[in-house]
Amino acid sequence: MFTASKLKVMQLRSYDLFLDLDFQNLQFRGRVLIELESERDVTLNSIGLRILNSRSDGKTLDFEQSGEDLLIKTGPFKGTVEVEYAGSIPDLLVGIYRAPYDGTYMVTTQFEAAHARRMLPCVDHPDYKAEFKLTLKIDKDLDAISNMPIESVEVEDDKKVVSFQKTLRMSTYLLYLGIGRFEEAKERLGDIEVIFATSTGKAGKGQFALEAAKRSLEFYQSYFGISYMLPKVHLITVPEFAAGAMENWGAITFREAALEVDENSGFKTRRRVAEVVAHELAHQWFGNLVTMKWWNDLWLNESFATFMGYKVVDTAYPEWSVWQEFLITEASGAMARDSLKNTHPIEVDIKSPDEIEQIFDEISYGKGACILRMIEAY
């Protein structure tokens, strides 16, 4: 498994990804063209994928797989590497996976921290950003969501080819793909389309989340002095989801309970939904547009979004007095976690992706947010 120091020999420009997805049998075949420059043989990350071939300019390239590394024998290289491969869609809740509900399922992705390699061979490292061009071949009765709006749809018998607009330069962990049958509710904030996407029959539960998202976007655009960079943002409910939410750029995913509000939902539910929406939208600037070089700085990524989420909700809903909740939830939670023998500093020296999952906790989120609030008030 390679680390940041070994990756400095490579520069990435773009991924052009095509996936032919068998929704019924939960299989897919992929082809990715990666434009890059490398001082030596190209090393990519890949796990659970069956590599069929690799080539460049029509010439077959030898390759070796070892653990999660895919070594393509290019020598010093500048150009486009093409890799064809096949994979399956498990129930792992990371990478590309199946999320069941009501006798059916959706296919969704969760790539943070280092799971994009489960859907495509890539340099799965936050500092190695690239543009992504995604094209899918799926059943024609299915819907598809990704980071960018759909560019074109071409029907081929019982299938359709869906092409999405090219993304901005971004890290692999922010790429998103969702396939299934979605129902949507939409609002607009200027040129930005804000979309609540959920399983059929639940679109009415997204109105409060849409309102909270619009208020958050207005706040951040003013606070940062930088407009939201994409033409749309999806808020997507996922029925089986290990995280509370995930800030995929332009296609944010949530647990259903973290996003849905109806007439029976109380004040605490609405407050929690507003906080989570504001947190994930903060990442669209801090984390997505501006990104840490390595996971040592996860605390700043997450604590800043936590801190900003409270600022937004306090501005949008001042009657809720959320800074009192901050003391109860974030400060007290961090102190309790910090009292344990296995606590850790807010900045942790991460040697490999295997260690990253261990620090998504009250220290990285809550303690870091408390320190940022202290700094602001200093």
What are these regions (language model features)?
Residues 164, 196-378:
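Hydrophobic alpha-helical and helix-loop surface patches within well-folded domains
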Residues 1-232, 257, 360-362:
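Acidic/His-enriched low-complexity segments
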